[in-house]
Protein backbone atom coordinates (compact mmCIF):
# COMPACT_ATOMS: atom_id res chain seq x y z
CA UNK A 1 0.00 0.00 0.00
CA UNK A 2 1.32 3.43 -0.94
CA UNK A 3 2.10 5.71 1.99
CA UNK A 4 0.47 8.65 0.22
CA UNK A 5 -2.75 6.68 -0.25
CA UNK A 6 -2.74 5.54 3.37
CA UNK A 7 -2.25 9.15 4.50
CA UNK A 8 -5.25 10.23 2.42
CA UNK A 9 -7.30 7.51 4.10
CA UNK A 10 -6.23 8.75 7.53
CA UNK A 11 -7.08 12.37 6.72
CA UNK A 12 -10.47 11.58 5.20
CA UNK A 13 -11.32 9.20 8.05
CA UNK A 14 -10.60 11.91 10.59
CA UNK A 15 -12.52 14.50 8.57
CA UNK A 16 -15.56 12.20 8.45
CA UNK A 17 -15.39 11.36 12.15
CA UNK A 18 -15.05 14.97 13.27
CA UNK A 19 -17.73 16.40 10.98
CA UNK A 20 -20.44 13.72 10.84
CA UNK A 21 -22.11 14.72 14.09
CA UNK A 22 -21.21 18.39 14.27
CA UNK A 23 -23.60 20.84 12.53
CA UNK A 24 -21.04 21.58 9.81
CA UNK A 25 -21.77 18.89 7.17
CA UNK A 26 -19.57 15.83 6.77
CA UNK A 27 -20.67 15.37 3.14
CA UNK A 28 -19.64 18.91 2.28
CA UNK A 29 -16.25 18.50 3.90
CA UNK A 30 -15.66 15.14 2.21
CA UNK A 31 -16.54 16.56 -1.21
CA UNK A 32 -14.05 19.39 -0.73
CA UNK A 33 -11.35 17.25 0.92
CA UNK A 34 -11.76 14.55 -1.73
CA UNK A 35 -11.14 17.09 -4.48
CA UNK A 36 -8.14 18.62 -2.73
CA UNK A 37 -6.62 15.17 -2.18
CA UNK A 38 -7.63 13.95 -5.66
CA UNK A 39 -9.55 11.10 -4.09
CA UNK A 40 -13.01 11.55 -5.56
CA UNK A 41 -13.27 8.82 -8.20
CA UNK A 42 -15.66 5.86 -7.97
CA UNK A 43 -13.45 4.07 -5.44
CA UNK A 44 -13.26 7.28 -3.47
CA UNK A 45 -17.04 7.40 -3.24
CA UNK A 46 -17.13 3.83 -1.94
CA UNK A 47 -14.45 4.79 0.57
CA UNK A 48 -16.72 7.59 1.83
CA UNK A 49 -19.49 5.06 2.43
CA UNK A 50 -17.14 2.85 4.46
CA UNK A 51 -15.89 5.66 6.69
CA UNK A 52 -19.46 6.87 7.28
CA UNK A 53 -20.20 3.37 8.53
CA UNK A 54 -17.24 3.65 10.89
CA UNK A 55 -18.58 6.93 12.24
CA UNK A 56 -22.08 5.57 12.86
CA UNK A 57 -20.70 2.55 14.70
CA UNK A 58 -19.04 5.00 17.10
CA UNK A 59 -22.50 6.35 18.00
CA UNK A 60 -23.82 2.82 18.41
CA UNK A 61 -20.99 2.09 20.82
CA UNK A 62 -21.48 5.32 22.80
CA UNK A 63 -25.21 4.64 23.22
CA UNK A 64 -24.97 0.85 23.31
CA UNK A 65 -26.78 0.52 26.64
CA UNK A 66 -29.67 2.72 25.54
CA UNK A 67 -29.94 0.86 22.23
CA UNK A 68 -29.88 -2.50 24.04
CA UNK A 69 -32.60 -1.34 26.44
CA UNK A 70 -34.80 -0.17 23.57
CA UNK A 71 -34.35 -3.39 21.59
CA UNK A 72 -34.98 -5.61 24.62
CA UNK A 73 -38.09 -3.64 25.56
CA UNK A 74 -39.75 -3.45 22.15
CA UNK A 75 -42.39 -6.03 23.09
CA UNK A 76 -42.92 -5.11 26.74
CA UNK A 77 -41.84 -1.53 27.52
CA UNK A 78 -44.16 1.29 26.30
CA UNK A 79 -41.35 3.83 26.66
CA UNK A 80 -39.04 1.78 24.43
CA UNK A 81 -41.85 1.25 21.92
CA UNK A 82 -42.59 4.98 21.77
CA UNK A 83 -38.91 5.79 21.31
CA UNK A 84 -38.58 3.28 18.45
CA UNK A 85 -41.71 4.66 16.77
CA UNK A 86 -40.34 8.20 17.05
CA UNK A 87 -37.08 7.20 15.38
CA UNK A 88 -38.95 5.45 12.56
CA UNK A 89 -41.35 8.36 12.03
CA UNK A 90 -38.46 10.84 11.92
CA UNK A 91 -36.52 8.67 9.48
CA UNK A 92 -39.22 8.06 6.87
CA UNK A 93 -39.44 11.55 5.25
CA UNK A 94 -35.74 11.70 4.34
CA UNK A 95 -35.76 8.14 3.01
CA UNK A 96 -38.75 8.84 0.77
CA UNK A 97 -37.25 12.04 -0.62
CA UNK A 98 -33.86 10.38 -1.10
CA UNK A 99 -35.41 7.55 -3.12
CA UNK A 100 -37.33 10.01 -5.29
CA UNK A 101 -34.75 12.76 -5.77
CA UNK A 102 -31.46 11.09 -4.78
CA UNK A 103 -30.10 10.60 -8.30
CA UNK A 104 -30.97 14.16 -9.34
CA UNK A 105 -29.37 15.60 -6.21
CA UNK A 106 -26.13 13.67 -6.75
CA UNK A 107 -26.01 14.66 -10.41
CA UNK A 108 -26.65 18.37 -9.92
CA UNK A 109 -25.83 19.41 -6.35
CA UNK A 110 -22.72 17.45 -5.37
CA UNK A 111 -20.24 20.20 -6.22
CA UNK A 112 -18.14 22.68 -4.21
CA UNK A 113 -20.20 25.76 -5.12
CA UNK A 114 -23.44 24.21 -3.86
CA UNK A 115 -21.62 23.04 -0.73
CA UNK A 116 -20.23 26.53 -0.09
CA UNK A 117 -23.63 28.18 -0.49
CA UNK A 118 -25.22 25.58 1.79
CA UNK A 119 -22.49 26.21 4.36
CA UNK A 120 -23.26 29.93 4.39
CA UNK A 121 -27.05 29.59 4.39
CA UNK A 122 -26.91 26.94 7.10
CA UNK A 123 -24.67 29.14 9.23
CA UNK A 124 -27.12 32.04 8.95
CA UNK A 125 -30.02 29.76 9.92
CA UNK A 126 -28.14 28.57 13.01
CA UNK A 127 -27.46 32.16 14.06
CA UNK A 128 -31.13 33.06 13.60
CA UNK A 129 -32.23 30.01 15.59
CA UNK A 130 -29.86 30.85 18.45
CA UNK A 131 -31.00 34.48 18.39
CA UNK A 132 -34.62 33.35 18.56
CA UNK A 133 -33.91 31.18 21.59
CA UNK A 134 -32.09 34.03 23.31
CA UNK A 135 -35.06 36.35 22.75
CA UNK A 136 -37.44 33.73 24.13
CA UNK A 137 -35.49 33.72 27.37
CA UNK A 138 -33.39 30.58 27.03
CA UNK A 139 -30.57 32.09 29.06
CA UNK A 140 -27.92 30.41 31.17
CA UNK A 141 -28.06 30.97 34.95
CA UNK A 142 -30.65 33.78 34.97
CA UNK A 143 -30.40 36.28 37.82
CA UNK A 144 -33.42 37.82 39.49
CA UNK A 145 -37.08 36.78 39.52
CA UNK A 146 -37.96 38.64 36.33
CA UNK A 147 -35.24 36.90 34.36
CA UNK A 148 -36.09 33.58 35.96
CA UNK A 149 -39.73 33.90 34.89
CA UNK A 150 -38.62 34.88 31.39
CA UNK A 151 -36.39 31.84 31.20
CA UNK A 152 -39.22 29.57 32.34
CA UNK A 153 -41.67 31.11 29.89
CA UNK A 154 -39.34 30.64 26.95
CA UNK A 155 -37.79 27.36 28.05
CA UNK A 156 -38.01 24.33 25.75
CA UNK A 157 -41.09 22.20 26.33
CA UNK A 158 -39.16 18.96 25.82
CA UNK A 159 -36.28 18.29 28.21
CA UNK A 160 -35.95 14.53 27.72
CA UNK A 161 -35.82 12.29 24.67
CA UNK A 162 -38.46 10.11 26.34
CA UNK A 163 -40.93 13.03 26.30
CA UNK A 164 -41.02 13.21 22.49
CA UNK A 165 -44.23 12.23 20.74
CA UNK A 166 -44.63 11.15 17.13
CA UNK A 167 -45.61 14.66 16.01
CA UNK A 168 -42.38 16.09 17.43
CA UNK A 169 -40.43 13.30 15.74
CA UNK A 170 -42.13 13.98 12.41
CA UNK A 171 -41.22 17.66 12.58
CA UNK A 172 -37.57 16.79 13.21
CA UNK A 173 -37.76 14.26 10.37
CA UNK A 174 -39.04 16.92 7.99
CA UNK A 175 -36.18 19.19 9.03
CA UNK A 176 -33.77 16.34 8.27
CA UNK A 177 -34.90 16.41 4.63
CA UNK A 178 -32.98 19.65 4.10
CA UNK A 179 -29.80 17.67 4.72
CA UNK A 180 -30.21 15.98 1.33
CA UNK A 181 -28.59 19.12 -0.06
CA UNK A 182 -24.81 18.60 0.40
CA UNK A 183 -23.30 21.12 2.77
CA UNK A 184 -26.47 21.52 4.81
CA UNK A 185 -25.53 19.00 7.53
CA UNK A 186 -27.83 16.23 8.71
CA UNK A 187 -26.98 16.84 12.35
CA UNK A 188 -27.35 20.59 11.89
CA UNK A 189 -30.77 20.24 10.26
CA UNK A 190 -32.10 17.88 12.93
CA UNK A 191 -30.60 19.72 15.91
CA UNK A 192 -31.62 23.21 14.84
CA UNK A 193 -34.97 21.91 13.56
CA UNK A 194 -35.56 20.22 16.90
CA UNK A 195 -34.72 23.39 18.81
CA UNK A 196 -37.10 25.43 16.67
CA UNK A 197 -39.85 22.90 17.39
CA UNK A 198 -39.42 23.03 21.17
CA UNK A 199 -36.67 20.53 22.01
CA UNK A 200 -33.90 21.59 24.35
CA UNK A 201 -30.46 21.83 22.81
CA UNK A 202 -29.33 18.67 24.60
CA UNK A 203 -32.42 16.64 23.65
CA UNK A 204 -32.20 17.79 20.02
CA UNK A 205 -28.54 16.76 19.92
CA UNK A 206 -29.15 13.36 21.49
CA UNK A 207 -32.13 12.60 19.24
CA UNK A 208 -30.04 13.64 16.24
CA UNK A 209 -27.47 11.01 17.18
CA UNK A 210 -30.12 8.30 17.33
CA UNK A 211 -31.61 9.39 14.00
CA UNK A 212 -28.19 9.02 12.39
CA UNK A 213 -28.15 5.28 13.09
CA UNK A 214 -30.94 4.09 10.74
CA UNK A 215 -30.30 6.84 8.17
CA UNK A 216 -26.57 6.30 7.74
CA UNK A 217 -26.69 2.54 8.29
CA UNK A 218 -29.44 2.17 5.69
CA UNK A 219 -27.63 4.43 3.23
CA UNK A 220 -24.40 2.48 3.76
CA UNK A 221 -25.98 -0.90 3.03
CA UNK A 222 -27.86 0.47 0.01
CA UNK A 223 -24.86 2.24 -1.53
CA UNK A 224 -22.51 -0.70 -0.94
CA UNK A 225 -25.01 -3.01 -2.60
CA UNK A 226 -25.23 -0.74 -5.64
CA UNK A 227 -21.44 -0.50 -5.86
CA UNK A 228 -20.76 -4.19 -5.14
CA UNK A 229 -19.19 -4.72 -8.58
CA UNK A 230 -16.46 -2.21 -7.71
CA UNK A 231 -15.56 -3.81 -4.38
CA UNK A 232 -12.24 -5.63 -4.24
CA UNK A 233 -10.19 -7.46 -1.65
CA UNK A 234 -7.27 -5.24 -2.63
CA UNK A 235 -9.09 -2.27 -1.12
CA UNK A 236 -9.53 -3.81 2.33
CA UNK A 237 -6.36 -2.20 3.68
CA UNK A 238 -7.19 1.36 2.66
CA UNK A 239 -10.84 0.95 3.65
CA UNK A 240 -9.80 -0.47 7.02
CA UNK A 241 -7.53 2.49 7.77
CA UNK A 242 -10.26 4.99 6.98
CA UNK A 243 -12.83 3.01 8.95
CA UNK A 244 -10.71 2.88 12.11
CA UNK A 245 -9.81 6.57 12.08
CA UNK A 246 -13.41 7.55 11.35
CA UNK A 247 -14.62 5.42 14.26
CA UNK A 248 -12.09 6.78 16.74
CA UNK A 249 -12.47 10.44 15.79
CA UNK A 250 -16.29 10.18 15.73
CA UNK A 251 -16.32 8.52 19.15
CA UNK A 252 -14.25 11.33 20.66
CA UNK A 253 -16.33 13.96 18.86
CA UNK A 254 -19.66 12.58 20.09
CA UNK A 255 -18.49 12.53 23.70
CA UNK A 256 -17.14 16.05 23.41
CA UNK A 257 -20.30 17.42 21.77
CA UNK A 258 -22.57 15.99 24.47
CA UNK A 259 -20.57 17.91 27.07
CA UNK A 260 -20.31 21.03 24.91
CA UNK A 261 -24.05 21.50 24.33
CA UNK A 262 -24.71 21.39 28.07
CA UNK A 263 -23.12 24.82 28.50
CA UNK A 264 -22.67 26.34 25.02
CA UNK A 265 -24.72 27.30 21.98
CA UNK A 266 -23.99 26.56 18.31
CA UNK A 267 -22.87 30.03 17.26
CA UNK A 268 -19.19 29.01 16.86
CA UNK A 269 -20.24 26.38 14.31
CA UNK A 270 -22.41 28.92 12.51
CA UNK A 271 -19.54 31.39 12.11
CA UNK A 272 -17.24 28.56 11.02
CA UNK A 273 -19.73 27.51 8.33
CA UNK A 274 -20.10 31.07 7.03
CA UNK A 275 -16.34 31.72 6.98
CA UNK A 276 -15.55 28.37 5.36
CA UNK A 277 -18.23 28.84 2.72
CA UNK A 278 -16.93 32.30 1.85
CA UNK A 279 -13.38 30.94 1.55
CA UNK A 280 -14.51 28.19 -0.84
CA UNK A 281 -16.41 30.69 -2.99
CA UNK A 282 -13.49 33.13 -2.97
CA UNK A 283 -10.96 30.48 -4.01
CA UNK A 284 -13.32 29.20 -6.70
CA UNK A 285 -14.02 32.54 -8.34
CA UNK A 286 -10.45 33.80 -7.98
CA UNK A 287 -9.08 30.64 -9.59
CA UNK A 288 -6.81 30.00 -6.61
CA UNK A 289 -8.19 26.46 -6.36
CA UNK A 290 -9.60 24.69 -9.41
CA UNK A 291 -12.71 23.24 -7.82
CA UNK A 292 -14.48 20.84 -10.15
CA UNK A 293 -18.19 21.29 -10.80
Swiss-Prot record:
GO terms for molecular function: undecaprenyl-diphosphatase activity. InterPro entries: UppP. Its main location: membrane. Coiled coil: none annotated. Its EC number is 3.6.1.27. GO terms for cellular component: plasma membrane. GO terms for biological process: cell wall organization; peptidoglycan biosynthetic process; regulation of cell shape; response to antibiotic. Catalyzes the dephosphorylation of undecaprenyl diphosphate (UPP). Confers resistance to bacitracin. This is Undecaprenyl-diphosphatase. It comes from Cupriavidus pinatubonensis (strain JMP 134 / LMG 1197).
